[in-house]
Amino acid sequence: MNPIILDAGDLLFTTSTLVDSNRSSEIYRGSAMIKGFDKIGCDAINVGQFELAAGLDPLMKIASQTSIPFISANLLDSNTEELIFKPYTLIDRGGIKFGVIGLTDLVSDTIEQLIVDDYTIAGNIYLSAMEGRVDMTVLLINSDRSTYGDLHEIFPSADLIFTSGSTFMTRPMMDQKENGPFVFSSGREGRYLNQVDISIMDDGGQIINRSYHEAKINYFKKRIDRYRDRDPGVPLNELYSEQPSILSSISES
């Protein structure tokens, strides 16, 4: 197995603002995190609000200490009006080519040296630029929890979206927009991982979120088993003949 390892942002520090009392320890933490990811292996880190908690210069110093690409498609240098980081990275793994784009909606535009472009416009520009160049497009988005429900409409041509910026976590049983893009959230500070296994059965076909359907089947199976435990030898339609609500639930399962 040779997985693609990505971070959607808010990795380096534990807060969006550093002060004298925590600056040294937080910068040490950020450097230690990068050293750890260097050993583990990481294919891209999206620049989120926490990455800029110490300012741009400390972030650039940390980024210079690693070969891991920091990406951002909507953070510009205020002096040159050019992107500070590469907007995306291309990854070829297992015969599948991925285009991974970094975006943020949480970084304050009051930070010196920084211009924050509209992440929705920047994201769609680079998604369009990748058409025909990659098999799958992946967005790493650092944004508020309130935006997650709209991301599939904002970026309809994306395949997978991984978010940071809140403690919200997706579960396999959570329903996703049919045909994608599928949105995944892993909480905060790298405490949890979202593992997505991808199999391409039909090039150009629709994307199916298999984990949701499997979780749903397992849930209904357990529910029917609980109903059957009451008297395993009696058919369910006889066992609950006088309980139409349960029969309806069994039928739905």
Walk through the language-model features, giving the residues of each.
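Acidic, metal/ion-coordinating pockets
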Residues: 1-253
